[in-house]
Design a protein with these regions (language model features):
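Extended basic-aromatic, gly/pro-enriched interface segments that bind polyanionic ligands
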Residues: 109, 134-219, 223-231, 256-258
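A short glycine-rich, Lys/Arg-flanked "PGG" loop and its adjoining helix->strand segment in the class I
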Residues: 233-245
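Residue-level signal for inorganic ion chemistry
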Residues: 97, 218, 243
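Conserved AdoMet
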Residues: 2-111, 252
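Core SAM-dependent methyltransferase catalytic element
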Residues: 217, 258-276
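Conserved beta-strand signature within the Rossmann-like core of class I S-adenosyl-L-methionine
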Residues: 246-253
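Conserved SAM-binding loop of SAM-dependent methyltransferases across substrates and taxa
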Residues: 117-134
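Conserved class I S-adenosyl-L-methionine
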Residues: 107-121, 140-142
Length: 276
């Protein structure tokens, strides 16, 4: 079996363990994400596309460019960021959101901190619109992501029709337009729903966040798993400081923050309340 430190002969571009290690360092510096050795093939596949576009022949040259070119740093992070999502993924979170909104009708602000291609913030918006019975509720929904490319897709709000098949019929009818002609097989989020969500680029590793507070609800699902424990605690601490005392913090199914009792306390399955 070929070891990671060896150059794989059949690959289009020379790619060594040293290259992988440098990719890992650069990604951690720019986004705070640590790469496991098992991500070797994924790194090669995604970054090889950038080498082809830039007409480069060596990973070494590409990584030199990344180190000194701000625009390419953005492409680099975008290429290596995993974006897996769907409408109403982990549905118990949206049931909890609906209940919370009914119990706290005066909330003002919801932050979806890992928007990806938009399915999560639009699921939040559908829940908010349903509870308040209007597309103009007194709630601001801000959706951020480090990946500017996926935010463009999110703002456009165009998806495969297959992606909404699992939604209730009245949701499909109320919140989506069916595509016709060249757009057959696609759907677009209703304009009224799209206007409920503000999409912005934000890196959770940045020393400052351009996000208004106080925040009543934070969705930060399946993001912290990419950070080491020290980084997790720092980000969670910063988020909690932005929240209202009765706020709701929603984590991903594989994330557990019970080891931070000084920051949050459980109030449901992967749902927490800030300790203020």
């Amino acid at each position: 079996m070929t070891e990671l430190h060896e150059v794989v002969a059949q690959r289009e571009f020379a790619y060594s363990r040293r290259d992988f290690d440098r990719v890992s360092r650069l990604l951690f510096e720019r986004a705070g994400i640590r790469l496991a050795d098992s991500k070797d093939a994924m790194v090669y596949s995604r970054l090889a596309r950038r080498l082809r576009i830039l007409k480069l022949t060596r990973f070494k040259d590409y990584l030199e460019m990344v180190a000194h070119n701000h625009q390419e740093q953005e492409h680099f992070v975008n290429a290596l960021t995993t974006n897996l999502t769907s409408f109403f993924r982990e549905p118990h979170h949206f049931e909890a959101l609906s209940t919370y909104l009914k119990q706290h009708p005066n909330i003002k602000r919801i932050w979806c901190s890992a928007s990806s291609t938009g399915e999560e913030p639009y699921s939040i918006a559908m829940t908010v619109a349903s509870v308040f019975g209007t597309f103009t509720p007194p709630v601001t929904i801000v959706a951020t992501d480090i990946d500017s490319r996926v935010l463009q897709k999110a703002a456009a709000g165009i998806y495969s029709a297959n992606g909404i098949e699992q939604l209730p019929p009245h949701y499909r009818q109320q919140f989506f337009y069916k595509g016709k002609g060249a757009q057959l097989g696609k759907v677009r989020v209703a304009d009224e729903l799209r206007r409920m969500v503000q999409f912005e680029t934000l890196n959770l590793m940045s020393p400052t966040w351009d996000i208004e507070s106080p925040i009543d609800i934070i969705f930060c699902r399946n993001v912290m798993i990419y950070f080491d424990r020290d980084t997790q605690r720092k980000i969670l601490s910063r988020m909690v400081k932005l929240m209202t005392p009765e706020g709701m913090y929603v984590a991903g199914h594989s994330e557990n923050f019970t080891m931070y009792p000084e920051l949050v306390r459980p109030m449901g399955k992967t749902i927490y309340r800030p300790v203020n």
